[in-house]
Amino acid sequence: MAYDWRKEEYEVTRPGRTRIDYRQEIGRAHIPIGIEREFTVLDPERAEALCAWVSTLIPARGERPAAGDVGAAEYVDATVFLTPRLRGVLLDGIDTIDQLAQERAGRRFAEATPLERTEVLRAFEANDPLDAFPMVRDLTYEAYYAHPRVLDVLEQETGWRYEVAFSGGELEPFDEDLLARMRTVPPRWRKT
C-alpha cells in the first residue's frame, strides 16, 4: 500500500486497476448496529443480491439467524452511503457476482441455490480486482457479531455475555473544585 501525497490517500495498485484501500475509507463511517434501516445506495435488485451475498457468508444455523435477517446488507449499504468512494466498488462487486451467477447457474445470484451461490462467491473471491469481497465480508461480520439478537443467542449458547467496551464506566464521586482551574482556560477551538 502506497501513500500518494498529491491525492492525500492510500492506494493499492494491481495490473490494469487502481483500487482504494477500503479499510482506510470505512474508518470514517460510524453506523449504529441493530437499527432497522432502508437501502439508500442500492436499487431493489442489487439489494436482493447483497442480502443473498451476506446470507451466504453467514447462513442461519440453529437459533442463529442469517446475516441477511439481522440487517447486515443494510449495514453494508449504509456504510457505503457514508463513504462515497466505495460505492463503485460495491456496485461493481454485486454486478460481477450477478454476471457470474448467470454464466454458471443460468439465473441471478439472489435466485441461485445456496451451493451455487457459494461457488460463485469462491470464484469471485479468487479474482476480485477491487476488493469488494473482503469489504463486504468484513462489514458483514461487524454487523452480525455486534447485533443484539446474535449476541443474545451467543450468550444462550455459551454463557458468555458481551459487554460494550466503549460505553464507559461509572465515574466515582470527586471534589469538583479540582476542575476550577480548567474552567478558566479558554476554549481550544475556533467558533465558526
Task: Give names to the regions the model predicted.
Residues M1-D21, I31-I35, A47-E48, A52, ...:
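Mature-region segments of soluble proteins
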Residues E38-V41:
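Charge-rich (often acidic), low-complexity intrinsically disordered regions concentrated
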